[in-house]
Each structure stands twice: as C-alpha cells, then as structure tokens.
Swiss-Prot record:
N(1)-(5-phospho-beta-D-ribosyl)glycinamide binds at residues 22-23, 82, 286, 355, 362-363. Belongs to the PurK/PurT family. GO terms for biological process: 'de novo' IMP biosynthetic process. Its EC number is 6.3.1.21. The gene is purT. Involved in the de novo purine biosynthesis. Catalyzes the transfer of formate to 5-phospho-ribosyl-glycinamide (GAR), producing 5-phospho-ribosyl-N-formylglycinamide (FGAR). Formate is provided by PurU via hydrolysis of 10-formyl-tetrahydrofolate. This is Formate-dependent phosphoribosylglycinamide formyltransferase. It is an enzyme of class 6 (ligase). Residues 119-308 form the ATP-grasp domain. Mg(2+) binds at residues 267, 279. Gene3D superfamilies: 3.40.50.20, ATP-grasp fold, A domain, ATP-grasp fold, B domain. One of its GO terms (cellular component) is cytosol. It comes from the Bacteria. It comes from Shigella boydii serotype 4 (strain Sb227).
Amino acid sequence: MTLLGTALRPAATRVMLLGSGELGKEVAIECQRLGVEVIAVDRYADAPAMHVAHRSHVINMLDGDALRRVVELEKPHYIVPEIEAIATDMLIQLEEERLNVVPCARATKLTMNREGIRRLAAEELQLPTSTYRFADSESLFREAVADIGYPCIVKPVMSSSGKGQTFIRSAEQLAQAWKYAQQGGRAGAGRVIVEGVVKFDFEITLLTVSAVDGVHFCAPVGHRQEDGDYRESWQPQQMSPLALERAQEIARKVVLALGGYGLFGVELFVCSDEVIFSEVSPRPHDTGMVTLISQDLSEFALHVRAFLGLPVGGIRQYGPAASAVILPQLTSQNVTFDNVQNAVGADLQIRLFGKPEIDGSRRLGVALATAESVVDAIERAKHAAGQVKVQG
C-alpha cells in the first residue's frame, strides 16, 4: 500500500530533486499533481524546477558534505537525481542509512560515468556494444585510438550534452581531441572512452519503466543529434518487429541489472534487425520530451508513478508526434519570447523552461506537435520552434 501525505503538512511526502533543469521541472509538476512536497536543488539560483517547487537550495552537488547537509535539513522521503554530476558516493552512504535514492544509488553511480555502465553492459550482461577502450593519459589515449582505428569517437567518461566529444578521422585531430575532452568533462579533466564507429540506420531512446507491476516500454523514440545534443525527437520510430523485440530485451536486462523503480532512457543503435546498446540514463531523457504530447502518461508522470511505488498499468501512445528544441544564441539575463502566438495551435504546443539567463547557445524551450505522419509532425514542430523569437 502506498501512503501519500499532503504537501506542507506534518505528514507530507517529500521529494528532493538533485538537478532542477527542464526535466526536473516536469518531474516537480507531476509530483505537485499528487500533492507531494517538492524541494529543488541545483548549482544555480532560479533554475526551472525551482519555479514550481515548495522550497529550493543552491549547492555544489559534487560536494558530498553540502549534499548531506541539505538532505539532513529537508529530510526527503525520495532523493531524485536529474543530472550525472552528483556526489554519488554520498548517495550510496545516504541509501545505506535507509534513504530512498531514485531509482537506486548504484544505478546513479554506475551511470554517472560511461565506464561503469559500459562495463556492466558489455562485460557483465554481454550485450552488443561498439568496440571501446578507456584511457587516462594522452599517451594511452593515442594507443587506444591506434587500437580502435579510424574513424572513432572520444568522449569524457563524465560529460553530458555532447560536451568534450570529438569525431576523429585522422591523427592530425588527436592533440586537439584530447585537449577538448579534458575541458568537457563534468567533474573536470580525466579519463576518456574511445569508441569505434557503429554503422546504424537510426538511433532510438527506448523509455523503459521499472515499476511495482513490472517492466513497461514506451513506443521507441527516434531523434536527430547535432553537436552531441538533440534537435528533434519523434514517436513512434518505425522499426522491424524483431528489432523492437531485441531492443526491449536489451532494455529489460539493463534496467533490471541497475535496479530500483523509475523510468530509464535506454539509448540504442539500430541497423536493420540488429540492435546495439549505447548508453542509459536512470531518469527521464531529453529526447523523451515528445511524450508530453504523444502519450497519456508522459515520461515524467511515469517516473513519478514508478518511484512512488504506484502501478503503471499501461501506456497509451496517441500516434505520430514530434518535439523540436528552441535553441537561440545570445547573451542575456532578461530573456523574452516574441511571436509565441504563431507557435501554438491545434495539436501544437510549446514549453518555455524559464531558465534565468543565456550566454551563447542554450536550450530554452521545446515545440511539440502531432500530425498524420511522423514526417509531418517533425515539420510542424520545427516550424513552430522557428516561430519563437528569443530576445534579450
């Protein structure tokens, strides 16, 4: 039996978000729908989820002592990481002290860096992956590239949104690629992964829910990447029944091995009927924002339902849908959005995240569309995103 208290009352059920960006904001909103008290934590003030939380705190989440202090102050029933850059050893300590880390502290630690999850997938679970080597010095990096061959990709073991990644075609790129990887790591300079290039027809995110009533799958989400970050996503991605079956089997193995209840974003390469594991996030995925319009339960609603111990039951997908990011480039601490009236309409929505500032290129919103076909939905979403004029 799941007992939920009322926010701001003595018996409140309290959820603490570690990371308060646009994904955390939607998780906070879903918690609010169930009367759950929300505490938003991030490294900067006025982060998106803080706008819809009951309280907020600004800390360095890589500082284990600071993390413990805010947890002891707020006494959350659930600690919900939204990002990778967290003091995961402290999360493990807190979990050992009977706090509930979502989906579990082990999953958060393993997926915080690419080495942990790659070794789990390839070596423990024996799943198909790209060829790979790890290196923690420039000389070992050069040896790894020679071993893997060209072309290959280098990534910091700890980074997100494409930071620090380089597609390497020749030896002339090696010095700069190493330097860029050292600059792009979330927790500073360090270890990298060198991966062989996988031949694939398309990439998918298989949003997979581990809940009290078993493992559930959303329809596969296709997406287009540029500079290591997603630009458009769509659902459903068409694929053969055999490929879908293989994708679901890989995702099931990964989420059950990681453990805990919640939604996982399992990233996979698909080539005809073959499926290759890429990465997994133990939390809602940015490409999954399409589910805000494509499903009866968004990825955020599914995540909250699962970690609260509620059954999922089933997931209804409404048909062809797409998302397209609103990604301006400017410098401002007073952003405004013009021409919004031309970005909304029948089966057409936008979300503006409320980020407090921009300095360069930053994702500030997303357009969402449905249509008779995925191709039409993508075009509608892209057109709507382009209508929003970001000023500062």
